[in-house]
Amino acid sequence: MHILGDIGNTETKIFLVSLDNKITKKLTFITKDINQIKLEKLFINFKIDFKKINKILFCSVVPKSFNIIKKFLSKKTKIKCFEVKNLNLKSLIRIKANYKQVGSDRLTNAISLTNSQNNFIILDFG
C-alpha cells in the first residue's frame, strides 16, 4: 500500500492507494488546523495498518504542514516520506526553470502529461 497526499493552502487530502493503483481510502482536512494530536485522531478513524505501507509521497505547497505530517507518518511507518519537489525529476521532465521555484502541483501536472498514450485535459484551480 502507498500513502499519497496533496497539501494545499486550504485543504489537505491523503489517500491510501493499493498496489494496483486503486484509491481505497481518502482523508480530507483543513490544512491550517494540522498538528500531531489532530493527526493522531484522524488516523485512528482512518483505520490504517501502518505495517502494510511501503511508500509515501506528498505534493505540498505548505512546507510547515508537510513537515508535521512527514514527522507523524515517518514515526508511524518507519518509512521515509518524500515530497515531489525533493525528487530527482530531471529524467522525467525538462523545464527551463529552477525545480525548487515551481510548485509541486505544477510539476505533477507536467509529469502526468508525459504519458503519450492518452489524451489529457488538466484543470488546476489552485
Residue spans for each PLM region:
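Phosphate-binding/catalytic loop of phosphoryl-transfer enzymes
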Residues: 80, 92-126
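N-terminal phosphate-binding loop and adjacent alpha-helix
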Residues: 23-68
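Alpha-helix C-terminal capping segments
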Residues: 43-48, 76, 113-117
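Short hydrophobic/aromatic-rich motifs at helix boundaries and adjacent loops
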Residues: 14, 42, 81-84
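Short beta-strand-loop/turn "lid" adjacent to the catalytic site in phosphate-handling enzymes
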Residues: 49-102
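Gly/Thr-rich phosphate-binding beta-strand-loop-beta motif of the actin/hexokinase/Hsp70
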Residues: 1-24, 113, 117-126
